[in-house]
Amino acid sequence: MSYARRSCICGLFLLFLALVCEANSGFIGVKDSHFELNGSPFLFNGFNSYWLMHVAADPTERYKVTEVLKDASVAGLSVCRTWAFSDGGDRALQISPGIYDERVFQGLDFVIAEAKKYGIRLILSFVNQWNDFGGKAQYVWWARNAGAQISNDDEFYTHPMLKKYLKNHIEKVVTRLNSITKVAYKDDPTIMAWELMNEPRDQADYSGKTVNGWVQEMASFVKSLDNKHLLEVGMEGFYGDSIPERKSVNPGYQVGTDFISNHLINEIDFATIHAYTDQWVSGQSDDAQLVWMEKWITSHWEDARNILKKPLVLAEFGKSSRGQGSRDIFMSSVYRNVYNLAKEGGTMAGSLVWQLMAHGMENYDDGYCIVLGQTPSTTQIISDQAHVMTALARSLN
């Protein structure tokens, strides 16, 4: 390829990025149960890449972050969900309560700066239900070491010391001044939303009332620090006691949350659901799993539209990468369902597939890895959904 042609292609790509960034300026808001950007409906297709900050903490590995965000932008993806936590352990952001590794924080700074460059919005989560990257178990361990009497990890939602630890972390993240962009996180529209917790569960109170109290307290605290950004809980979508008949939609069990009551809290701006048929309804055939999946999505869309009156995001879904053909069929079906519901006014706002990675990241692969370009059929399905959702948003304007 000639130098002139390479220069032309590079120039066109930079122009494309400039136009994308200009179109994406401003904060995402909510109006009449749908997302809005600069006065127009906002629909999207997006992805999860939980590892971005963890990898970017090492400057020699930041090219992996750039690769994923660049490839996602080229494919038309516009929202990414990732972690703003790493509590204890390897490359910890929060080494101990209130003590942070600036090197890791600068990794998150880089993630936000790169996302802005490629026109991708971020949903940033504050803490994990699970032990990966610390989670609530790490908070409990810290509190016990400080002398607190805690009987189980689910006291995370009620114990004053644990709630104080989390509030300190939330404030540290929300008020952070980005070392690269020189913009405080709370003032940066690159961030679409904050997430209170990845997949909160409470085995000590299946009614969802304990988690509800915690969500109310934490949501009010976040909004006291930042009323510009949207806020969501991080829910998987399990129904609880508020509408008993809806519990039949659950995959056979409850987890101590209540999709309805937890999302009716005023400070929560939109609802989320997750879905993993390989795990939740593993004994069923692929066809039966697709039927269950459609019912799961549609039931929550009905409730988001009619009861919550808030947008709904399928914030995690995935299919094992062991069978590419079955995964492509599954993803096409899910995307078709999301699109068809989005046509009904935009309450169903988009979906975030789990998960995108860069080349050479096998050690991070949890069985759901997608490398854009490495599996052309899957990449095409993802990109097609991004473009039809963008076109649909324009038609709803």
From Swiss-Prot:
GO molecular function annotations of the record: mannan endo-1,4-beta-mannosidase activity
Amino-acid positions noted as binding substrate in the UniProt annotation, renumbered to this chain: W83, N198, Y276, W354
Enzyme class, first EC level, given as a word: hydrolase
EC code: 3.2.1.78
UniProt main location, coarse: secreted
Cellular component terms (Gene Ontology): extracellular region
TM ranges: none
Catalytic activity: Random hydrolysis of (1->4)-beta-D-mannosidic linkages in mannans, galactomannans and glucomannans
Catalytic residue positions: E199 (proton donor), E316 (nucleophile)
UniProt keywords, alphabetically: Glycosidase, Hydrolase, Secreted, Signal
Compartments where found: Secreted
GO biological process, one term: polysaccharide catabolic process
Signal peptide: 1-23
Family that this chain belongs to: Belongs to the glycosyl hydrolase 5 (cellulase A) family.
Listed name of the protein: Mannan endo-1,4-beta-mannosidase 1
Organism (species): Solanum lycopersicum
Upper taxonomic lineage: Eukaryota, Viridiplantae, Streptophyta, Embryophyta, Tracheophyta
